[in-house]
From Swiss-Prot:
Subunit structure: Part of the 50S ribosomal subunit.
GO molecular function, one term: rRNA binding
Protein name: Large ribosomal subunit protein uL22
InterPro entries linked: Ribosomal_uL22, Ribosomal_uL22_bac/chlpt-type, Ribosomal_uL22_bac/org-type, Ribosomal_uL22_CS, Ribosomal_uL22_sf
Domain of life: Bacteria
Name of the encoding gene: rplV
Similarity field: Belongs to the universal ribosomal protein uL22 family.
Stored PANTHER family: CHLOROPLAST 50S RIBOSOMAL PROTEIN L22-RELATED, LARGE RIBOSOMAL SUBUNIT PROTEIN UL22M
Amino acid sequence: MESSAKLSFARLSPRKTRLVVDMVRGKGIQNALNTLRFSPQPSAKLVSKLLSSAVANAEQKGVADVDRLYVKTIYVNGGTVLKRFVPRAMGRASKIRKPTSHICVVLAEKK
Protein backbone atom coordinates (compact mmCIF):
# COMPACT_ATOMS: atom_id res chain seq x y z
CA MET A 1 0.00 0.00 0.00
CA GLU A 2 1.27 3.46 -0.87
CA SER A 3 0.76 6.77 0.85
CA SER A 4 1.77 10.21 -0.32
CA ALA A 5 2.12 13.81 0.79
CA LYS A 6 2.64 17.03 -1.15
CA LEU A 7 3.98 20.44 -0.26
CA SER A 8 3.19 23.26 -2.67
CA PHE A 9 4.71 26.71 -3.01
CA ALA A 10 7.52 26.13 -0.50
CA ARG A 11 9.77 29.19 -0.48
CA LEU A 12 12.84 27.15 -1.38
CA SER A 13 14.95 26.97 -4.49
CA PRO A 14 14.13 23.77 -6.43
CA ARG A 15 17.78 23.26 -7.33
CA LYS A 16 18.93 23.36 -3.70
CA THR A 17 16.00 21.25 -2.52
CA ARG A 18 16.81 18.51 -5.06
CA LEU A 19 20.20 18.05 -3.38
CA VAL A 20 18.46 17.22 -0.09
CA VAL A 21 15.79 15.05 -1.72
CA ASP A 22 18.41 12.94 -3.51
CA MET A 23 19.92 11.99 -0.13
CA VAL A 24 16.77 10.19 1.07
CA ARG A 25 15.40 8.59 -2.11
CA GLY A 26 15.04 4.83 -1.66
CA LYS A 27 15.90 4.81 2.06
CA GLY A 28 13.82 3.50 4.94
CA ILE A 29 11.80 6.02 6.93
CA GLN A 30 13.94 6.03 10.09
CA ASN A 31 17.15 6.21 8.08
CA ALA A 32 15.78 9.06 5.94
CA LEU A 33 14.59 11.08 8.95
CA ASN A 34 17.97 10.65 10.68
CA THR A 35 19.77 11.77 7.53
CA LEU A 36 17.60 14.88 7.30
CA ARG A 37 17.92 15.68 11.01
CA PHE A 38 21.70 16.10 10.71
CA SER A 39 21.66 17.87 7.36
CA PRO A 40 22.64 21.57 7.54
CA GLN A 41 20.46 22.67 4.59
CA PRO A 42 17.33 24.70 5.46
CA SER A 43 15.19 22.61 3.10
CA ALA A 44 15.96 19.46 5.14
CA LYS A 45 13.59 20.60 7.89
CA LEU A 46 10.63 20.97 5.51
CA VAL A 47 11.39 17.67 3.75
CA SER A 48 11.51 15.82 7.08
CA LYS A 49 8.20 17.42 8.08
CA LEU A 50 6.73 16.25 4.76
CA LEU A 51 8.03 12.70 5.35
CA SER A 52 6.44 12.67 8.80
CA SER A 53 3.16 13.78 7.22
CA ALA A 54 3.35 10.94 4.70
CA VAL A 55 3.95 8.45 7.54
CA ALA A 56 0.90 9.83 9.37
CA ASN A 57 -1.13 9.43 6.16
CA ALA A 58 0.02 5.81 5.95
CA GLU A 59 -1.06 5.17 9.54
CA GLN A 60 -4.43 6.73 8.78
CA LYS A 61 -4.85 4.41 5.78
CA GLY A 62 -4.15 1.43 8.01
CA VAL A 63 -0.70 0.25 6.94
CA ALA A 64 0.17 -2.90 8.88
CA ASP A 65 3.75 -2.00 9.84
CA VAL A 66 5.02 1.57 9.66
CA ASP A 67 8.63 0.45 10.24
CA ARG A 68 8.60 -1.33 6.86
CA LEU A 69 7.90 1.87 4.91
CA TYR A 70 10.51 3.32 2.58
CA VAL A 71 10.71 6.36 0.30
CA LYS A 72 9.56 4.98 -3.04
CA THR A 73 9.36 8.26 -4.95
CA ILE A 74 10.33 11.78 -4.00
CA TYR A 75 10.72 14.66 -6.42
CA VAL A 76 10.85 18.44 -6.57
CA ASN A 77 9.27 20.57 -9.27
CA GLY A 78 9.72 24.28 -9.69
CA GLY A 79 6.79 26.46 -8.71
CA THR A 80 6.00 30.02 -9.63
CA VAL A 81 8.76 32.57 -9.23
CA LEU A 82 7.95 35.67 -7.19
CA LYS A 83 9.51 38.71 -8.84
CA ARG A 84 10.44 41.74 -6.78
CA PHE A 85 12.32 44.93 -7.56
CA VAL A 86 14.87 46.67 -5.38
CA PRO A 87 15.87 50.30 -6.00
CA ARG A 88 19.46 50.88 -7.10
CA ALA A 89 21.65 53.90 -7.76
CA MET A 90 20.82 56.53 -10.37
CA GLY A 91 17.12 55.71 -10.49
CA ARG A 92 17.57 52.14 -11.66
CA ALA A 93 15.95 48.99 -10.30
CA SER A 94 17.20 45.41 -10.09
CA LYS A 95 15.05 42.33 -10.29
CA ILE A 96 15.03 39.86 -7.40
CA ARG A 97 13.69 36.37 -8.10
CA LYS A 98 12.21 34.39 -5.22
CA PRO A 99 11.72 30.80 -6.44
CA THR A 100 9.19 28.35 -5.01
CA SER A 101 9.10 24.55 -5.06
CA HIS A 102 6.52 21.78 -5.15
CA ILE A 103 7.69 18.66 -3.29
CA CYS A 104 5.95 15.28 -3.61
CA VAL A 105 6.80 12.12 -1.65
CA VAL A 106 5.37 8.60 -2.04
CA LEU A 107 5.99 5.91 0.58
CA ALA A 108 5.55 2.18 0.04
CA GLU A 109 5.94 -0.97 2.14
CA LYS A 110 8.93 -3.24 1.67
CA LYS A 111 7.91 -6.71 0.62
